[in-house]
Structure formats: structure tokens, C-alpha cells
Curated annotation (Swiss-Prot):
GO terms for biological process: lipid transport. It comes from Mus musculus. This is StAR-related lipid transfer protein 6. One of its GO terms (molecular function) is cholesterol binding. The gene is Stard6. InterPro entries: StAR-like, StARD5/6, START-like_dom_sf, START_lipid-bd_dom. May be involved in the intracellular transport of sterols or other lipids. May bind cholesterol or other sterols.
Length: 233
């Protein structure tokens, strides 16, 4: 399987979703977060578009979302997350396990996803996600294996204030199992609002210092941590 080619194609699909402003129906607006949807052209379900403003630069926000440090700590929708294979510095394969939601009516799912970050003009970053097969990670009886059709984040500087970001999230998840579509459609909007708010809180709590600051403080940070047996990258 040519994971790199799939990753590039998925990023372009997410870019196309972001540029297509027609046919979206606003289904929820709460706490300065909006959720819109339209019928997916790929599977029998919906493509969701979530939008909000994050008080962080687009570069820092995309770095935070792609690196996945502390992911389970800030993302309340997950109970497990692991990077299982690194293809290159911009492309990863990850295994995620979700919490149950909709008051327990939707049980935990697991996903094997190809995650890729791509940089575009005007400081726009896209982090794309698409489910793939990966050796050694076949579905098990423990969790229902879900499938993410092309999904992802679009991080761009806010025009009025480039120190802030506009975050647009596209979600196109096939839950699998024997779930009525009505259960998914009823629960998704609130969960998507909660997720964007989790991002907003997480990027503030686990703030990543500017790259130049990281380089200049490298030696002092190393001295402080040299007594530890392991240091997270």
C-alpha cells in the first residue's frame, strides 16, 4: 500500500472540502463554535464541518494537533492513542480508541488512521486523516473497528489577528456496527463542539514554545532533564 500517495490525496480532498462552501446546513452553534453538515458523497452518512477560533498561531496549532503529545489528556473523546508507525516526519499511522458516547448507546470504537500534515501557501496547514489497513493491527473482538473517510483539520491565520487561528475540522466517520443513523446524527453535533473546545483548552494547557525559543533553550532544558530516564520527544 502506497501510504504516502494516499496521504497526499487525502490532504487534497480535505482542501477541496474547505474550499467548497455550497450545500452546508448549519445544525448547531454553541460557545462560538459552529457545526454544519452535508450528505457524504463517499458513504451513507454525513460530512461534518466544525469551525471555531483558537487563540494561538496557525503554526503552533497545527504543530500541537499533529504531534499528538498529551492527546489522551486533552481529547476527552479518546481512551487510547498510539503512533504505531512513522513513515516520515510528516506522515504517521496511528491507533486510536474512542470513549463510548451518546450516554453509552455508542460503544467504544478503534481506528487505524493514516495522519499527514501538509503546508500550503499563506501559512495554511492541513492535517489529514484516513483509515487504512496496517499489518499486525487487524480488527479484534474487543472493539468495533470504525473507519474514517477523508477527514482532517485546516489551520489558517485569522485575517483580523494573525496571532489567532481559524480552525476548520472535517469529520466523515463510519461508525460501523448496527447503529441507527438517527443515533449518530443526534449525538455528533454536541460531540464535535466539545472536541473543538477540547482543542482550545489543550493547546493553551500544553502550549508549545516558539521554534526559535526551543532551539535557544535546548541546552538548558537538557541539563534540567538529564537525570530522567526517559524524555518525551
Amino acid at each position: 500500500m502506497d501510504y504516502k500517495a494516499i496521504a497526499q490525496q487525502t490532504a487534497e480532498q480535505v482542501l477541496a472540502y474547505n474550499q467548497d462552501l455550497s450545500g452546508w446546513k448549519l445544525i448547531k452553534s454553541s460557545k462560538k463554535v459552529t457545526v454544519s453538515s452535508k450528505t457524504s458523497r463517499i458513504f451513507h452518512g454525513n460530512l461534518y464541518r466544525v469551525e471555531g477560533i483558537i487563540p494561538e498561531s496557525a503554526a503552533h496549532l497545527s504543530d500541537f494537533l499533529f504531534k499528538h503529545d498529551h492527546r489522551v489528556s486533552w481529547d476527552k473523546s479518546l481512551k487510547g492513542f498510539n503512533v504505531i508507525h512513522k513513515i516520515d516526519s510528516d506522515t504517521l499511522i496511528c491507533h486510536t480508541i474512542t470513549q463510548s458516547f451518546a450516554m453509552g448507546s455508542i460503544s467504544p470504537r478503534d481506528f487505524i488512521d493514516l495522519v499527514h500534515i501538509k503546508h500550503y501557501e499563506r501559512n495554511v496547514d492541513i492535517i489529514s486523516t484516513k483509515s487504512v489497513d496496517f499489518p499486525g493491527y487487524a480488527p479484534t473482538s474487543t472493539y468495533i473497528r470504525g473507519f474514517n473517510h477523508p477527514s482532517g483539520y485546516v489551520c489558517s491565520p485569522l485575517k483580523e489577528n494573525p496571532a489567532y487561528s481559524k480552525l476548520v475540522i472535517f469529520v466523515q466517520t463510519e461508525m460501523k456496527g448496527k447503529l441507527p443513523a438517527s443515533v449518530i446524527e443526534k449525538s455528533m453535533p454536541s460531540n464535535l463542539v466539545s472536541f473543538l473546545l477540547n482543542v482550545k483548552d489543550g493547546v493553551k494547557t500544553y502550549r508549545i514554545p516558539p521554534i526559535r525559543a526551543r532551539h535557544s533553550s535546548h541546552s538548558s532544558v537538557h541539563k534540567k532533564k538529564e537525570g530522567h530516564s526517559a524524555i518525551k520527544p
